[in-house]
């Protein structure tokens, strides 16, 4: 797994305690099977967040970890979690909650891959399948780690289909989304927490962490170690950011077609703010003979899985989506993100454009601005302390 190590090492963190920084995975005193899994997965040395947070998680402390997209946050809590669980016990010991099914499934794969030489039993519980299917697989194979969405996990717990007595660690990934009021996850998280042993460790992870979210964590965390990237470090170095003035909403489509015709794209994600707009744009592009796929939260799970697989394997190069795809989904070859609509939530800007330039690769983000978007763009620039440039007339300069 290739990081932009030069930039990664320059990141400035603020932490609640003086932290030991581990320069190598060997210095973390990890299980031999876990170490083999880490190197087999492609990691060579810990990223900045990994070098600070993994040993804190292993020590059993509650941890709040915040870092940019593409810096190895998922592996951070996964490595800590796999080191902590007792492989001799077949009970559920670790629970990871995420806001989307796709992210929960992806985390499940990371757990399986990193734990490949440990024979760890992990399962992704994401809805879209029957509870009977979930139960059958858990009973057949056993389960030490579950990665799931809050609704499905809570339902399984309430029906006593999964046992939480032995859960040692609860991880909230993309915690700002899980603990906000917008999607209704917060009360589900509280309910799940009350069903766990009082001694359970809590790890909270996200690319953005507002003061409001940090305040909420006090309700269920015990003197957590905070490892936070300083605000001016969140701007995703390595991603060129541009805007193009389109004046009117109806002119966006022609602008998109011009860009599509002019660039050689490895893979691209186009973000819209509504499911209706995603469907409309996908239909319009297909009518114009552009090959695209699309995904949003109203689609059936098997259809979403098919789309994700097509995009992840490179069968499709252009994906149109709502913010359901902005959170943590890792496809290495994405080189371009287009905000057809500027995000309505400021924090989602970094989640969206972080889909390009993964692990230090170069990426490009293009923002379409109508007249009414100009002030919104200024808000985003002010929040992240960045200056987004106008798109050059010669599009070859983008690469």
From Swiss-Prot:
Q: Name one GO cellular component term.
A: preribosome, small subunit precursor
Ranges for domain Helicase ATP-binding:
54-227
Provide the family line: Belongs to the DEAD box helicase family. DDX48/FAL1 subfamily.
Gene Ontology terms for molecular function: ATP binding; ATP hydrolysis activity; RNA binding; RNA helicase activity
E.C. numbers: 3.6.4.13
Q: What is the lineage of its organism?
A: Eukaryota, Fungi, Dikarya, Ascomycota, Saccharomycotina
Q: Where is this motif: DEAD box?
A: 173-176
Protein name as catalogued: ATP-dependent RNA helicase FAL1
Mind telling me which SUPFAM superfamilies this protein's record contains?
P-loop containing nucleoside triphosphate hydrolases
Which Pfam families does its entry note? Answer: DEAD, Helicase_C
Q: Per the record's keyword annotation, is Electron transport included, yes or no?
A: no
Q: Which InterPro entries match?
A: DEAD/DEAH_box_helicase_dom, Helicase_ATP-bd, Helicase_C-like, P-loop_NTPase, RNA-helicase_DEAD-box_CS, RNA_helicase_DEAD_Q_motif
| CDD domains listed in its UniProt record | SF2_C_DEAD
Keywords from the named record:
ATP-binding, Helicase, Hydrolase, Nucleotide-binding, Nucleus, Ribosome biogenesis, RNA-binding, rRNA processing
**Gene3D superfamilies to which the protein is assigned, alphabetical:** P-loop containing nucleotide triphosphate hydrolases
Instruction: Please list which residues make up the signal peptide.
Output: none
| Domain comment (free text) | The Q motif is unique to and characteristic of the DEAD box family of RNA helicases and controls ATP binding and hydrolysis.
Keyword ATP-binding, does the record have it?
A: yes
Short motif Q motif, span: 23-51
Q: What does this protein do?
A: ATP-dependent RNA helicase involved in 40S ribosomal subunit biogenesis. Required for the processing and cleavage of 35S pre-rRNA at sites A0, A1, and A2, leading to mature 18S rRNA.
Q: Tell me the organism.
A: Candida glabrata (strain ATCC 2001 / BCRC 20586 / JCM 3761 / NBRC 0622 / NRRL Y-65 / CBS 138) (Yeast)
Q: Which GO terms describe its biological process?
A: maturation of SSU-rRNA from tricistronic rRNA transcript (SSU-rRNA, 5.8S rRNA, LSU-rRNA)
